[in-house]
Each structure stands twice: as structure tokens, then as C-alpha cells.
Amino acid sequence: VTVIDTAVTTPIRWEAGGLRLAFEHDPDGPVRLVAIDGPEGDAASEPAGSARSAPRQPLVEVLSPAWGRVNNSYRYDGTALGAGLRLVDSTATSAGGVDRLEIVQRHEASGLVATTVLEAIAGVPAVRTTTTLRVEPGHAPLSVWAVTSLATGAVVSDAPNDVDLWWADSGWCSENRWTSRALRSPGLVAVDRTARGETSRNRLAISSLSTWSSGVANPAGAARDRRTGRTLAWQVEHNGAWAFELGEDPDWGHGGVPLEDRLFSETPFGPPRADRSRDGAYVAVLGPTDALHQWSVTLDGDTAFTTVPVSFTVAGSLDDALGRLAAQRRASRRPHAAGDALPVVFNDYMNTLEGDPTEGKLLPLIDAAARVGAEVFCIDAGWYDDTAGWWASVGDWQPSTARFPSGLPAVLDRIRAQGMVPGLWLEPEVVGLESRAARTLPDSAFLQRGGVRIVENARYLLDLRSPDARAHLDEAVDRLVDGLGVGFFKLDYNVTPGSGTDLDAPSVGAGLLEHNRALLTWLEAVLDRHPDLILENCGSGAMRSDAAMLRVLQMQSTSDQQDPLLYPMIAVGALGHILPEQAGNWAYPQPDMDDEMVVFTECTGLAGRLYQAGVLSGMDDHGLDLVADAVRVHKGTRYALAASTPRFPTGLPSWDDAWTTVAFDVADSPDTYVIAWRQAHAEAAVDLALPHLGGGDATVEQVYPAAGVGAGWTATRTAEGLRLDSGDGTGAPGARMYRVRVG
């Protein structure tokens, strides 16, 4: 237990962005975030008449080797410094459409000062929070191993027996696999832990590794009451290491005797307490930590540290909570006129040229892409390499002469002549061992350990803190944009450096965090110089799809998955943490596909930001017309999807689902767009839950493919939403897109 409530507490109340937050503090305890509610009457609000005790979890947890925890565990609650913080001041302000609450706390013995800043954008029911740590002058330096960006017992303490943790496991070509686990059994089992007067040592924990922020799991999660649906959701806004956990917080005020009251007592206390009805729970969300990521910093009079940002919200359902985080991401994005136009991009890589572009293969593909309506044509990996081994030669970014006898500029001119913006693939953060840059750049330009450059799969990794590294990249980008007229870059990131770099850093993980932040600063500077340049975020598929990168960049590749039958689960799952208008879902039709398979892969692209590929130059007129129709539909719906909240009528998808479905609830519109994919092993029909439609009448129109293409699907309005019937007794896969209009 971190804090035992005292009889007298003082509240701090803050309303912002449509949420109502309540904090408590007392003379003998730190500030605690005890309630997060929606507006009056909102389903996100705590049920009226709740008799639970206030959560005891401190607002800030700070783990230091000099102070440790008040109990023995490997959790990120119960830190001695967190328990010892006391309120100094709280200030609420508002400016530029952003409400701001600043809470300052101080730990007297160490001189630690923790300043927590919470911000909410007007009209967006979500809060972004960071905490800055410093040590007051005259106090000894303080080593820190971990500090929370968000820590609270609100929502999750309402009914710990009913709380499930939701998260999405991820991996190369298998991203966004959403799953849940109960906090108690099978999550944490009852172990009579109070027999020794100790809090639980266990927790449900999710974390990332290295610089692939979504390489192991997505940097977003939720805690949901499976009985009421009430959900607390969060996202880590960082392009590197992070962790979050959900754990128990026993209530010592009822039915139990703390360890300190047992010591030297003449009275036997017998077995552990049986009353756990007032136990609570907590959520802790962090950036990198010492135990997980080799991160630590030492605070002194000259050195402060600010945590990675975390945004959080609460809603009456998981869908609504994820939707409110989507609204937060949408409101926080860097404005970008060219990117916000949402042009249709054709990329020559996936199931097409596979990193082997040549003038002879590109020219007919360019013409075919223009015919179906593409607005950007991106030449992917290999354009700079004169051999077949493009992997280890990255880093110089000079056009190949062997691949383009007429010169790369002539190919880019052909793209422009067909009315499209030319684009190129770049992997800016790496330098291949066979490149000239590997020999000419100084060692200080690279991430390193013990004075040795880190090598991963025949590549070095640049350290974006280095002026030499940034100058190298600036020269390449400016040359390609100003000299060749490139208007789109696909930015890839296929290797990682492990825990980080110890060059000019207090710890390996701290060096990596500084590099991560320097990368974001460099990307901002690129767009400052080239405001019309569109940048796609691709990290070996979607291994770095986080809110920090997507605040700056315009588009995100959602996977490297090449099997069209496996992609829908990835595409729909991505919408749990990526905006539809940024979710670049690949569609890659092939000359040998039948109509249903062309429609299937194109529907995947339509479920977000259509990212077109495929050997279009080998398709007949009928096949090209099917693709062109999908592009036409996307152009007609892309701005609606960019104003929509994704909903999941058959639940967040699992890898082996027979049916995968998604609905786009368009703001300020009677329209909802529904896309459904049926696998070969599925039943012919499926029921979709669409409670946001209400019980009124609605018209349903199939928008893709056109009537008469493929099997005759039917869509019927039901009291719960919609019933789809594929009408196909053959068991073949299929997909359709519908518009449901209320009224």
C-alpha cells in the first residue's frame, strides 16, 4: 500500500475538454487522481451513489535507487518518493483553446520537485500529461530509474473483480492483435498476500523494446469494466521505449491489519483478512525504465527530466474510449495542407516490384497507376543501387544509373506527365556497411556502445543528436526535393539498435530517448523547409506506429503483410491506435486474381487510407476497372472517413476471426460506412452490432463493388444494427463496403 487515506482530504477539481477530473491530497499524503468522469449524464461518468473509498494511488511515482519502494516488488507503484511527495501548488490556466492544469509537489528530504502538467484541447474529451522532475539547489544529486507519466486508481478501482486489461500484441506482418485479460483470475490470482501485511507483488504488464515502439505491442491500452463497459484508455506518445501496467491496490482500512500494527503486539491476529470488497487497483504508464530499457538519469541543479507524454480518456464503452483517443490524435496533428488532401498513393513495392525497380518495369506501371486514378507514385527500395543487393548499400541516396538508362529524372518526369506527384523510398536513420557514408561520416554520427558503432544486419544506425548525422540527411533530402522534384517520401526503418547508446549519455536508454526526440525534431525541420512534402511513416511495416511519429507525419503503412486474406485483421486492428486517414492499408490486386479477390484486397485499402500497389500493368481492362472503381469510391469517402470514429461491430479483430468488420461513424452526418470481410471458413451470414445508429430507420447501399460484381450479398437492417449475408454457398472469401444512412 502506498498511501493510507486520512480523515481529512482536500479536493482539486478540473473540468476540461469535456472531462471532469478530481484530485485529492492531505497533509500526510501526495496528490492522487481519484476520479475521471465525462460530462454530466455521460456514460463515462462514475455511477451515482458509488460507495467505494477513494483510490489511494499517487499521481506520480518515482523510483530511485536511493529511496526504493515502500514494499518489495517489481511494480511501478509503491515508490518511496511517490508516497513522500506533498502538494506545493496547483494552477489552472487556459490559452489558445487549450486548458492547462499544473500540479507541483515536493519531497522534502530529497529536494525532489515534481511538476505534473495536464492539458486538454477544447472540445476533445481527452487529457495529455507529462511530469517534469528536478532537484532543488543545495540537495544531493538524485538518480532516477523510472517515473510515471500517468498513475491513477480512478475507474479501475470501481470494481477490480470486473476489470479487463486490453492491449494489442504486435509483430512483423502480424500487427494489431487485440486481446484482453482479467485483472483477477486468470490475471492475478488470490494468494492471501495480506497474511504478511504486504501488497501484491504482481501486475499485468505490457512493454516495448528498443526503437520499434509498436514492435512487440502497440503503445496504447485500456482497462474496461466488463459488466458496465466503462473504460479508461491511454496512449503513449513516444517513438521509443515505454511500459504500462495494471495491478491491485489492497485497502488496509477494512478488515486487515497493516504489518506495522502487528509488530511487537501481544495479540495474535490469526489468518489474513477475508474482506477484499474495498480493494482497489491502479494503472501506471511510463516511458523507458532501468529494469526494462537500461534507462536512468541523475537529477541535479542543472539537469531536469520530462517524461514522455501520455494521453488518456474515459468513456462508457471500449469503442467510445478508443474513439476519444482518435479525436485527441486528430486534434494534435501537425497541420499539413498537402497531406490533409489525402492523395491516393501508388507504391511499387508490395507484391509488385519488391525492391527491384527498373525503367523498363516502371514505365508501364506508371501508366497503369495513372489510369486507375493514383495521385502519387512512389518508387520504393532499390532506386539508388546498381546491384541486386540494395540492403547494405543504403545511405548515400544517389540515383542508380544501371536501373534507369534514361536517368531517374526522366522516370520522375513520366510520373509528373501522368498527373501524379513523384515519390521515393528512404531509410534515413541507417547507413549500409557498403555505402560511402559509412566511411566518410565520423563515429560520433552513429549510435554506439563502448566506442564501437552498433551494427545490425549490415547497417549502422545514425544518432540524430549528431550535427553530422543531421547534415548528412538534410543534404540528401534537400537534393532530392529541390533537384529532382520529389514530393513524397516513404520513410522506412528496418533495424533497431538494442537498448541504445552510451555516447554522451547518462545511461544507454537515456541516450536512445534523446535520439528518439532528436528524430522528431529533425522531421519537423524537414517539413518546415519543405511544407508541401508528404512523409509516410513505415517502420518495417508498422513496427513504429505511435502517436509521436504520427503527430508529425502524414501517413502510416499498417503492415508488410503480403497475404491479402490475412490483412483485414491487421487493417481493422490498426484503427485502435491509428487514425483512418493515416492508416495506409495496402491493396495489391494481381492479374491472376478473380473479381472477389480483387474486391477483397481493395476493401482492405478502403478501410482507411488506400495504399495502392499490385501488378496493374499486367491486368486486363476488366481488372483495371475494378481497381479504378475502388479508387473512385475512396476519393468519394476519404474525407468522411477523416471525420469518423471507427467502431468494431463484431469486436476488435482476432487473428483467426471468420468475419472481420469495421464501421466508420461519420461526425455531423447521418452516414456510417461499413466494411466486412468473410473468410472461406466463415458462416454465410453475420450480425453487426451498431448501437450508435439508434433504433430508427436506415437505408443501406452497397458502395463497393458495384452491383452485379461477384456474389450477391444482402444487407438487412436489424434492431441491433445490420445483418450481412454473403449469399455464397461456395465458401469463397469475399468483402463488401456499404453506406448506412439513418433517417
Which functions belong to the PLM regions below?
Residues 341-343, 354-357, 400-401, 428-479, ...:
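Active-site-adjacent "subsite" loops/lids of carbohydrate-active enzymes
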Residues 2-269, 701-713:
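Polysaccharide-binding surfaces and accessory modules of carbohydrate-active proteins
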Residues 21, 36, 54, 519-715, ...:
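Active-site-proximal substrate-binding groove within the catalytic cores of carbohydrate-active enzymes
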Residues 385-435, 525-530:
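Acidic/aromatic-lined carbohydrate-recognition and catalytic surfaces
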Residues 297-316, 731-740:
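Short Pro-Gly-centered flexible turn/kink motifs
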Residues 131, 302, 346, 377, ...:
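Conserved, mostly hydrophobic/aromatic
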Residues 344-348, 379, 422-426, 489-491, ...:
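Hydrophobic faces of well-ordered beta-strands that scaffold small-molecule active sites
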Residues 361-384:
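Catalytic domains of carbohydrate-active enzymes, especially glycoside hydrolases
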